[in-house]
Amino acid sequence: MKKIVITMCACALMAGAVSCKKEKIDPIEQDPVPVYAEGIYHPVMKLATVTEDGVLTQEWNWVGDNLDKITSPDGGATTYNYTGNYISKVSTAGDQTEELRYYYDESNKFTKCEIFYDGMQAVTMNLTHNAAGKLSGAEVLVEDSFLLSLASGLLGGGSLFEQLVGRQAAESMIIMAKLQHAKNPKFTMGSKEFGMVLDWNGENLSSQVINGNASIILDTNDLNLLRMFIDIPEEYQGLIQMVMALQGGLPLTLTLNDTIACTYDTNYNPFFCNWGEIFSHRNLSLNNALTMTNTGAVKIAASLMGQTMDLYSYPLSDYQEYEYQYNEKRYPTKVSSGTEVLYTYKQ
């Protein structure tokens, strides 16, 4: 049995932060990331830093067969390697290592990104292009969500979507900007572990759980919606916590038949939710009012747009120490705070 102890702010659990204040990441401060290269694919490659609106702010060329390694301009612990098949970006923080592999085809189109933590793959992202060579879709598959979230906490990750596209705000924004102008764009996010898939076609966002009974239908064309509902520090990126992160009066319907437990911070945001047999409530329903109740022994009611909310039995302090225990497959088995066991997981 392995143990890891993380001390964080309760409302930023697993987010790698020590402050409850949510601050926007400035893309200009991010490490340079690969964007669409112009000219010959090999041996010329361009790397650039982009702003939120996709404007290049820094660019340099990577030229020649003999130049197989470059480092970030600030001399930080980030190294780029060209293997012949992909660009490998390796970053270190303490004894943790993150590797991003950016794949390009012979016409310089960015086609795939893979994310590894300590040599273990967490995410695969595939990009599709139309006949004109423009980006038309993105598919993100979570290979190991616990590994992804654990790395997020230790490496100081941002929103889940930023992690899924390489924990780069600039990269995620330019991808979404290109999708915004694509004809019939498609975005798919799924988890191989939990059989989840979530699709967005530019107008509607729908979701289903393959190995369960849950469905979500969101009627909106707001591109920022993705970043809003995915920006949750949660190790099981389940469907309920995504919905609960929504702010505002978006048309929303959620019906599910499963066991859910959620804890909320003082700003009515869930910082921990779990699909597990923790409580015995069933047949939950969440509609436009964004209020959830249950018929079991524990009442959970929250309104993200309203003024009131009921928390179940344990108080939230500004800072708590959480101890995560997990098995040899890297799945959590227990969450504790001091001597109090907060959650146990069905194995």
Task: Show the residue positions of the predicted features.
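Buried hydrophobic residues that stabilize the cores of well-folded domains
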Residues: 22-347
